[in-house]
């Protein structure tokens, strides 16, 4: 990979708690505008990897090094609001640094995510799909050059899942950002990803879905169900969030 296109480098990164190994000898380069999907069983170290990239924890050994000024947008796996906190959608979005984006980019996000009618609503009263759209907007309004989505499909209805798949597909081109998507949704990862990293406390295998499907390490974890994965085709049409 050309150094000028590299956004972030993890070099021989390991993380231990006492004698317990959570991650071992992780080497990952994330390029500008690249989309990477991370899969693995429960306890594989996916959440630990995200925390290391976010800088929430320090590696036991190895280095996590940005190759350019890094602005990370993060959509967490879980988000809860205390019942006593009267937090409106507009309050949460006001915390984002909207001045980073041009007016038309901000409007695109609001239109694409169908947010205008939600602005006065309490976060506590939103559905799972509505909450996910608001969290995604908040991350995008910071104009990240790296967007991390942690299990973005969790708890969504099928219609919202389809919309979000399509929206994720369009994001790198629109915002010129890299994306790291952590997902248990093996069907989407193998059909909709260009580069996949399979994690099980170390990197078992990585590459394009067609390469992973014939990997013995992948088949040990997930079986032989993905020997001929669908070739990804970008979506050209406009898609808006379910209202």
From Swiss-Prot:
UniProtKB keywords: ATP-binding, Cell inner membrane, Cell membrane, Ion transport, Membrane, Nucleotide-binding, Translocase, Transport, Zinc, Zinc transport
Taxonomy, superkingdom: Bacteria
GO annotation (BP), single: response to zinc ion
MF (Gene Ontology): ABC-type zinc transporter activity; ATP binding; ATP hydrolysis activity
Sequence positions that bind ATP: 40-47
EC class (word): translocase
Gene3D superfamilies xrefs: P-loop containing nucleotide triphosphate hydrolases (3.40.50.300)
Record InterPro entries: AAA+_ATPase, ABC_transporter-like_ATP-bd, Metal_Ion_Import_ABC, P-loop_NTPase
Cellular compartment(s): Cell inner membrane
GO cellular component: plasma membrane
EC id: 7.2.2.20
Reaction(s) the record says it catalyses: Zn(2+)(out) + ATP(in) + H2O(in) = Zn(2+)(in) + ADP(in) + phosphate(in) + H(+)(in)
ABC transporter domain ranges (all copies): 8-225
Membrane-related topology note: Peripheral membrane protein
SUPFAM superfamilies recorded: P-loop containing nucleoside triphosphate hydrolases
Family according to the record: Belongs to the ABC transporter superfamily. Zinc importer (TC 3.A.1.15.5) family.
Function of the protein: Part of the ABC transporter complex ZnuABC involved in zinc import. Responsible for energy coupling to the transport system.
Subunit structure: The complex is composed of two ATP-binding proteins (ZnuC), two transmembrane proteins (ZnuB) and a solute-binding protein (ZnuA).
Protein name per UniProt: Zinc import ATP-binding protein ZnuC
């Amino acid at each position: 990979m050309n150094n000028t296109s590299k956004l972030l480098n993890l070099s021989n990164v390991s993380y231990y708690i006492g004698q317990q190994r959570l991650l071992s000898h992780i080497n990952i380069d994330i390029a500008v505008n690249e989309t990477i999907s991370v899969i693995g069983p429960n306890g594989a170290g996916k959440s630990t990897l995200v925390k290391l990239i976010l800088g929430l924890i320090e590696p036991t050994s190895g280095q996590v090094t940005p190759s350019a000024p890094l602005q990370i947008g993060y959509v967490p796996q879980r988000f809860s609001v205390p019942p006593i906190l009267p937090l409106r959608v507009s309050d949460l979005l006001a915390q984002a640094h909207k001045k980073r984006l041009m007016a038309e980019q901000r409007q695109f996000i609001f239109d694409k995510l169908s947010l205008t009618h939600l602005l006065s609503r309490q976060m506590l009263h939103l559905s799972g799909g509505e909450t996910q759209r608001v969290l995604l907007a908040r991350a995008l309004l910071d104009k990240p050059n790296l967007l991390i989505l942690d299990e973005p499909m969790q708890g969504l209805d099928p219609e919202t899942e389809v919309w979000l798949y399509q929206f994720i597909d369009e994001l790198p081109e629109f915002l010129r950002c890299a994306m790291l998507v952590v997902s248990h949704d093996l069907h989407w990862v193998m059909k909709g990803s260009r580069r996949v990293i399979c994690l099980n406390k170390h990197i078992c295998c990585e590459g394009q879905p067609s390469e992973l499907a014939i990997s013995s390490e992948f088949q040990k974890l997930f079986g032989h169900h993905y020997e001929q994965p669908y070739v990804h085709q970008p979506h050209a049409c406009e898609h808006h969030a379910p209202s």
